[in-house]
């Protein structure tokens, strides 16, 4: 006769290990620690002022864009990233982004793209309210920090049509 308690204990330990592994994976996917969201003002279809009060770093911004665990940009967008395989085709190519959008327009598209298109599939990278189907690791946390948003904006404004 099997001991039910020991089989249950093994299943519980196994389930706890799986839950712990999934939690570790989710928290390592890029969600930033809770931070106080910095205020911003939307003017028309743009956020004209930097979220941080300073310009971002385009080199760091490029790193965020190509990091599939952090920025997730290349899941939907393609761009001038020859070293990156399997770039997305669902959204506009990022090549020439600053020829199509101003710095402020790019910032709003990153912070809250639903302000421009309520049906967009693009995530709001700097918003924590009015979101649906958000994983536990992402709740009450922006995907990117204000500094990372500014870094991505700084990178995107370097992408001009040739």
Cite the ranges covered by each PLM segment:
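Acidic, Ala/Val/Gly-enriched low-complexity intrinsically disordered segments
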Residues: 7, 15-19
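Bacterial Sec-dependent signal peptides at the C-terminal "C-region" and cleavage site
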Residues: 27-35
């Amino acid at each position: 006769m099997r001991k039910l308690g020991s089989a249950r204990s093994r299943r519980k330990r196994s389930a706890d290990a799986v839950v712990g592994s999934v939690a570790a994976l989710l928290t390592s996917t890029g969600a930033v620690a809770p931070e106080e969201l910095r205020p911003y003002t939307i003017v028309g279809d743009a956020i004209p002022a930097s979220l941080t009060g300073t310009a971002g770093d385009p080199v760091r911004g490029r790193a965020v864009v190509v990091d599939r665990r952090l920025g997730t940009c290349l899941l939907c967008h393609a761009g001038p990233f020859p070293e990156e395989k399997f770039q997305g085709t669902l959204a506009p190519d990022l090549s020439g982004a600053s020829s199509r959008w101003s710095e402020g327009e790019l910032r709003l598209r990153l912070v809250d793209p639903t302000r421009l298109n309520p049906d967009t599939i693009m995530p709001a990278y700097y918003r924590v309210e009015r979101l649906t189907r958000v994983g536990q690791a992402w709740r009450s946390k922006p995907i990117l920090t204000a500094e990372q948003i500014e870094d991505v904006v700084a990178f995107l404004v370097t992408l001009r049509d040739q």
